[in-house]
Amino acid sequence: MIDDIQLSFGLPSVLRKKVTAAFDGGRLSSDSGVMLLALADRRRRVADRLAVLIADHRDPAHITHTVADVLRARMLAIGCGYPDGNDFDRLRFDPAFKLACGRLPETGADLCSQPTISRWENAPSLREIIRLTYTLVDIWCGSYAKPPRSVMLDIDDTVDVVHGKQQLAHWNAHYDERCFLPIHVYDAATGAPVVVILRPGKTPSGVEVRKLLSRLIGRIRRHWPDTCISIRGDAHYGRDEAMTWCENNGVDYIFGLPGNVVLDRRVEPVADDIRVRRALDQAEVLRGFAETRYAAKSWQQERRVVARIEASASHADDMLRRGIDIRYVVTSLQESDAEHLYETVYCARGQAENLIKQHKAQLSSDRTSCRSALANQMRLILHTGAYWLLLDLRAAIPSWNPLQHTEFATIRLRLLKIAGRIIETASRIRIALASCCPEAETFSLVALKLQPSGP
């Protein structure tokens, strides 16, 4: 009773009745939907596949929390919106999280604590981190029932601001911050993460991009030796070293390319025609396309360059731009015309920014506050594992339901943040979910879809 009085707080009265509240409801959970993520993990086995790669030197007779248990709890918490390990000060007692991790909600042992999580985030060696990162590629390849004929991979980096003296932190003048610039690679067709790699906060060099592509494509070729692979990225990745490697290894590419006076001179006749036609037609915007063969001084050969040329009224008085805006891409693709390559193929890479936003903003993968670069890479791996769980959960939503096309934050709100009371008896466990849940039908259908097919 003393504890209840200490925890109670008042709320506005309703119809002259006093309202008080206290966190004394007992074995309740505000995240009962975590059971859906647990079903997704049982199918994908992300935690188990990662755990076997981390050496555990503890005495098996005295282990309460296996490595798989620790990683699974961490990924489930990230998926439910708890990216901070300190949240386990309370979550370790949550009955829904305990049940999702394979423990009895009342009589079972509590989950691991924050210090245990931190120790295992810092435990993997460099070789283990490399193997764990390669496993992300293996998980993606395993998501296909059979090798695809072709895949398009989107590659991009994102700023991850740091506030300490972490390893690999670097000053970036463009962002005016000390930061990391981790590289994200996604499957353009499915939105699935292929790999996420922590790196210093500076623009990647051509040699760095070449090495990354060499290791990534080499790993993919182990699974799919005959699949046609294409790489799509902005001008950061359109370096001669990377393009030469792609050409020598049967990989197609389409990259952004910075403009210069040589390229502008090559497309000037087309640009002038578009500028004049826009003025004569008094159109607000007129767009056209051109292409040429071009080789920068540092390039070993000429390559196909496509130009998107846009004349608009807003640029008409701009003396520097001469009433025109030109964007270039360089590509090894030869079959399509210039308009299709730019409008359909290259511009579709904008979706990668939305995928990075889900990874970074909605799963808080920028919580890279460990001093060690290896520990921060381990965090990116765990956040990518949580991404897979939410991706599988979204795929299990019926096609007629608009939730199948929503972002992770909405799915978390509608399907994971559901109140429930978990009751453990001698022979069974019952989860009593909120009766007024708006997504009760969807929750049931998703749970059935994610059920394992075996006995």
Residue ranges and their predicted role:
Residues 1-177, 181-204, 210-223, 418-455:
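Dynamic "connector" segments at or just before major functional cores
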Residues 4-22, 252-361, 449-455:
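An anionic, glycine-rich sequence signature occurring as long contiguous blocks
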Residues 13-19, 50-54, 95-99, 245, ...:
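Short acidic (Asp/Glu) and glycine-rich catalytic loops that position anionic groups and cofactors
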Residues 156, 226-238:
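Acidic/histidine-rich, metal-coordinating catalytic segments
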Residues 243-252:
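Short, surface-exposed basic-aromatic patches at helix termini and helix-loop junctions that form
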Residues 384, 389-433:
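C-terminal structured "cap/appendage" subdomains that terminate the fold
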